[in-house]
């Protein structure tokens, strides 16, 4: 491990009875970065977070935080905080007491506690909310209180367990921007779990896609989307239309239609049978053109920006294309 490797999981396996849910997983998160675990339901992402937190014990393998082996350490001794989906706030306590609860358990004096609570609430744009109660604030504000409660402890590692799932679309967008801003400003090493790809892309330095207890690919969002390393990733990361083709000298032939692959040489793609994935935004509709494939519109769905249209090629394959709403 290098000095910059802050959170490290080595050869982690987790089994419940005979069911192996995490299969010999290796994971490294650099100091001060945020990494998101993304994947289909049941892929093991939440189990990984629980293992890091100390809420579950691995069947085998080791977990290191800042160079220290914490595999057998309790959650209290890992210097970790978790922001939950459910907020987990105490309704009988004021906002200030909720945020300061962990400090009180650590024996921090009243005066210092009040100052740190004040600073934490200012960080999440809730200055002056100390004396309010949970039922007096909105869901988005409650999630910011939960975030302040974690930040006030200044943990080595901050964990997020699908924290925005209970919020509406606009609140999710503003909260993910706030989470990313604070994580970068404070430099807290963070592990984030979500099923929302947009959310994962927005908050992360790197995204890890999991499936069946294994890491399928770890990369920045742009690389994951544009250069998936498998058919599973191509289908999972956004919409794709997948065609059988044959590659020769950087050009894929799809049933007689030629598609130049500009990255073929860079990645030393061999000639021969291949699968070609085409993103909806890479296709343009036109009445005619020299480089066009004749298609028939099967259906159109208005989604605001953009509009989705399902086309059928002359060879019977379905193709999804995005276009502007005025073309509806």
Curated annotation (Swiss-Prot):
GO terms for biological process: transmembrane transport. It is an enzyme of class 7 (translocase). Residues 7-237 form the ABC transporter domain. It is found in: Cell inner membrane. Keywords: ATP-binding, Cell inner membrane, Cell membrane, Ion transport, Iron, Iron transport, Membrane, Nucleotide-binding, Translocase, Transport. It catalyses: Fe(3+)(out) + ATP + H2O = Fe(3+)(in) + ADP + phosphate + H(+). It comes from the Bacteria. One of its GO terms (molecular function) is ATP hydrolysis activity. The keyword Membrane applies. ATP binds at residues 39-46. PROSITE patterns: ABC_TRANSPORTER_1 (PS00211), ABC_TRANSPORTER_2 (PS50893), FBPC (PS51242). It is a peripheral membrane protein. SUPFAM superfamilies: MOP-like, P-loop containing nucleoside triphosphate hydrolases. Its EC number is 7.2.2.7. Pfam families: ABC_tran, TOBE_2. One of its GO terms (cellular component) is ATP-binding cassette (ABC) transporter complex. NCBIfam families: PRK11432.1. Belongs to the ABC transporter superfamily. Fe(3+) ion importer (TC 3.A.1.10) family. The complex is composed of two ATP-binding proteins (FbpC), two transmembrane proteins (FbpB) and a solute-binding protein (FbpA). Part of the ABC transporter complex FbpABC involved in Fe(3+) ions import. Responsible for energy coupling to the transport system. This is Fe(3+) ions import ATP-binding protein FbpC 1. The lineage of its organism: Bacteria, Pseudomonadati, Pseudomonadota, Gammaproteobacteria, Pasteurellales. The gene is fbpC1.
């Amino acid at each position: 491990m290098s000095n910059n490797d802050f959170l490290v999981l080595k050869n982690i396996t987790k089994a419940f009875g005979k069911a192996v849910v995490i299969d010999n997983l290796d994971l490294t998160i650099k100091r001060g970065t945020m990494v998101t675990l993304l994947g289909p339901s049941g892929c093991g992402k939440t189990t990984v977070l629980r293992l890091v937190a100390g809420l579950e014990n691995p069947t085998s393998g080791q977990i290191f935080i800042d160079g220290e082996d914490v595999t057998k350490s309790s959650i209290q001794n890992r210097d970790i905080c978790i922001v939950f989906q459910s907020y987990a706030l105490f309704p009988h306590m004021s906002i200030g007491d909720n945020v300061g609860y962990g400090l009180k358990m650590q024996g921090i004096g009243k005066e210092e506690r009040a100052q740190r609570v004040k600073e934490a609430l200012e960080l999440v744009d809730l200055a002056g909310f100390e004396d309010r109660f949970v039922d007096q604030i909105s869901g988005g504000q409650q999630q910011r209180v939960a975030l302040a409660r974690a930040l006030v402890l200044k943990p080595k590692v901050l964990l997020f367990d699908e924290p925005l799932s209970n919020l509406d679309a606009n609140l999710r967008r503003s909260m993910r921007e706030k989470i990313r801003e604070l994580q970068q400003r404070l430099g807290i090493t963070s592990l984030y779990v979500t099923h929302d790809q947009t959310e994962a892309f927005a908050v992360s330095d790197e995204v890890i896609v999991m499936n069946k207890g294994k890491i399928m690919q770890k990369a920045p969002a742009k690389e994951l989307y544009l250069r998936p390393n498998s058919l599973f990733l191509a289908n999972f990361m956004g919409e794709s239309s997948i065609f059988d083709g044959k590659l020769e000298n950087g050009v894929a032939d799809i049933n007689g239609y030629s598609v130049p692959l500009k990255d073929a040489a860079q990645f030393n793609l061999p000639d021969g049978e291949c699968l070609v994935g085409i993103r909806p935004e890479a296709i343009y509709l036109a009445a005619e053109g020299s480089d066009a494939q004749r298609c028939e519109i099967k259906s159109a769905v208005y989604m605001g920006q953009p509009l989705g249209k399902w086309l059928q090629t002359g060879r019977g394959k379905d193709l999804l294309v995005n276009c502007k709403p005025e073309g509806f």
